[in-house]
Amino acid sequence: TNAAGEHLDYTYHYNQLTDIACSVYPENNVHYEYGTSADASINAVGKVILQEDASGWQHFRYGKLGEVTVNFRTYTPPYESKAFTIPMAFEYDSWNRIQKIIYPDGEKVSYDYNLGGMLKRVTGEKDGDTYKYIEEIRYNPFEQKEAVFYGNGTRAYYNYDVLLRLSHLQSICADGVMQDIDYDYDEVSNINFIENHAGTLPNTLGGTYRSDYTYDNLYRLTYAVGNWHGNNTLYYETSLEYEKNGRISRKVLYTDTWLNGVFSGSHFDNRYHYDTTYQPNTVRMIDGSHNHAMDWDAKGNLLLHHNGYAGYDRRMCWDEQNRLQGVVDYGQQLSYYQYDAGGERTYKFTGEYTAQNQSGQWHYFYRLDKSTLYASPYIVSNEKGYTKHYYAESERIASRIGGGGLQELDKGMGNEPDKFDNHKERANHLLERTADCLEVSVQPMWDVLSYLYEWQEIKEEEKDCYW
């Protein structure tokens, strides 16, 4: 039972968890089924073979070392009448290293390793065609990346100091040098400065930049200053003050921007006020150039964010496990989320609201007409199409897009329709294009940057969860 009086009920069969019941949002209930002696052929005796949660069902098959080799996920969207099954298959070696991933559309991605057991190459194969995602990774004697040669011709080179900290990174694409970055550290490995020497590329993207950082005796960031010179020019300067207990008490920011020869500048001086009773670490008000007011629930989740500068409220709803269930932006949109049993987001529904006046009273109606399915770290789909993500260990190295959305991805479970030929051609085109620089994004060290690739969404409704 949490501070709001919400509770979860757990049911066991001996030592096996079989059910999780939620007191407020029963649609988030979870059910597990385990393998018996009859499931020995898929190495599932005593292991979870079926998981039922808010997103749908998952069926599992296992290898001899207990690794998941097949995962069938059937999704049941609450606002749609159809269900979608998306399988993924995995192959491992005797060291439990991933050898192959088979995507729902039939593409087989293989992982090769060097004699030291480190990842060396990542390639894909589909319909007889081969795609190189990573041609080669080279390592230094300390097993740190020294050079990465990507399949689209992009190259990255890494250098380290005597303490094995990254000291220099150079990235080269077809247009030239994208990054030529130096890193400098203090005695306790805080970053002193980051400086990029690579200039503007022929397509006007990129540019040189530098940021310097200063810390107090407790290694907290107190001052940062930086600039960027490219097709346009940007300068910023920020300072932070802290209370004795470590809470931020003040933040000052100056920015100067020259865009297309036009100068603009901004400045804010914000002071943070905290709850002095039951939640001493929750910000109740930020006053200054931009006034904000916040309200929190008993569990410490943000319920209301009043933006005095923009003039609107944002309201949030959370479930028993402190997962964001919904966001309402008055005058903008409603977003609703679903999660699987592991707490991973699987669905996002969004839509705009409409207002009607009946007999002098306003009535508000919301329509959730857009959806995004996060099938796994490897597949993201919406009504326009789907994106496949590729990884080298925990690092995402490439993305490819396909058309047709969930329906077409679901059809790919059987005979592949003609649309996958179009997907293949488009993917080749993107891989060729990504050898050229399409996008350059630079953010302060303390900021959080979402994916900005043109085929990957940016979750705007969550952007101000960070200050």
Positions of the model-derived regions?
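A residue-level detector for well-ordered beta-strand positions
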Residues: 8-10, 32, 60, 90, ...
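Short loop/turn segments immediately following beta-strands, especially the blade-tip
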Residues: 37-40
